[in-house]
Amino acid sequence: MFSVKKRQHVNSPTLRTHRLIVKLLFLFILTTLALSACHEKEEHLFLSLDSISQISDESMLVSEESLREAIHHMVMADSDRDVAAMQTRRHYLNGGAIRWMTRDGVSAKADSLVAYLERVEQVGISPKLFYASQIKDDLERVRSLNFGEGKNSVSRVYGRLEYLLTKAFLRYTEGQRFGFVNPREVLNRLDVRDSDSVRTTYRQLYDVPTKRPGKDYVALAFGVMGSDDASVAKFLRESEPKNPLYATLVRHLSDPLSKADLQRLQTNIERSRWDHGDYPQNHSKYVLINIPSVHLLAVNGEERMTMRIGIGSLKTKTPLLNSRVKRMDFNPQWVIPKSIVKTSIRHHAGSRAYFDSHNYFIINRNTGKQVDPSTVSADMLMSKDYGVVQRGGVGNALGRVVFRFDNNFSIYMHDTSNPGVFSQRDRSVSHGCIRVARPYDLAVFMLSKKDEAMMERMRYSMTIDYRPSHTRGNDDESEKQKESIDKKKMLGSLNVNPQVPIFISYYTLYPDQNGTLVPYPDVYGYDNVIYNSLKGYLASGQ
């Protein structure tokens, strides 16, 4: 154990003598601590120095046991449920290594952390979350030997510092690096898919690859805490958000904003913290769909093309995801989802006229053969053994071209047989897929080279009066149609090579091509959900 004499008059020689003794003792003790810091558990961090205990007041003695006891007191008093708090508690409950002490007392790396904590309000986050004032006060007590009794006793101060520095370090670096709100938790528990007395399942609305602080990251963070000041400072710098949009948004926190505008800004800043590992700006060619804007942006180097789109309705929201456009299908057939069969088609079971008028046919999934619509019941239509398909060509709901990309929702971008939707202000009209207003232009964009011959084939395939016959047998009209089609020009599928990255995102505040931030309506209500989870982290008044 080591001793610290109670504070005397500032000019007292006795005080100066005891301060020197304490510093020498603390240097010796913490040198021993530093040598053992490579171990995750230490049984004797502070040496017992009974031979000099007579120079000390009992209330000013600190030992490893009393330090651990003080840390344990902090653990038991901490009821926070965020990830950083639980990681901190787990570390010390398991006897984890002391991280912030050096041969000189408290490491200078604590000052590096405090420097970041003092600036968190500039990025809209509350300093109270990181105990900045308490840490600064305790650092001053340690460096001036201004200890007292009770909560400010030497052991309580050191225990509190150790615990709060660790918790603040984890909370800051994880919050900035990964976001303070987990989007998968808040966005994937909104729309109920199915509910019964046993459990409730939800529709997945957010499927963007998003990193979270896992075991490897936590181990790295604790390793850095036990390292030197330069390593801590570097780790703090590298924890800043990687999304280029983050810095753009943060700059506007000092603008005079209404309460609603400030909340919108803070919510989008939080979105920009989420670490997706990949961003549109990483690519020279990409497609960006920002759902609230109800527009598509296609970028190829310096070339930019925008177009209106239709998105999923409130009941069938377009999911958020990243992928790559890999193929274009011309005059595609539409395999109609069971959800649409249930709501729009099943009550027409048995009506051949209805199926013929919509260019629908029914297929037996087991045999692969078409089935006469007049022989099919509503229950058969809803079973897994039968499917309803719309023939490709003029009048198909998917239009004349579909843009395919891998995802977990069977969604895609496509043309439409109802272009009037693009003149509407509210274009939340689909079952989740994305309708594009200029499908031919988007198809040309997907080409790696502007091949005139290929462009002509695409134009021909998308404009020829292609109407597959829905009647049994071949009448004169269908025969004439077949003869009029130039099969050499008709395209079926065309691979996109190289594949084009596509980002389906959700920002209600996003810069235009001139860098001006443009607000968009919160079409799916995600802002409120995110803000309600975020507001506990925000600086006063925000």
Go through each PLM region and give its residues.
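Eukaryote-specific, cytoplasm-facing alpha-helical/coiled-coil scaffolding segments in long proteins
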Residues: 191-203
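A sensor for short, sequence-defined functional sites
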Residues: 180, 189-190, 205-210, 214
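Bacterial Sec-dependent N-terminal signal peptides
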Residues: 1-48
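Cationic-aromatic interfacial patches
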Residues: 39-194
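Intrinsically disordered or highly flexible coil/loop and linker segments, enriched in small
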Residues: 34, 175-182, 334, 452
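Well-ordered beta-sheet/strand-loop patches within structured domains
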Residues: 2, 38-86, 170, 190, ...
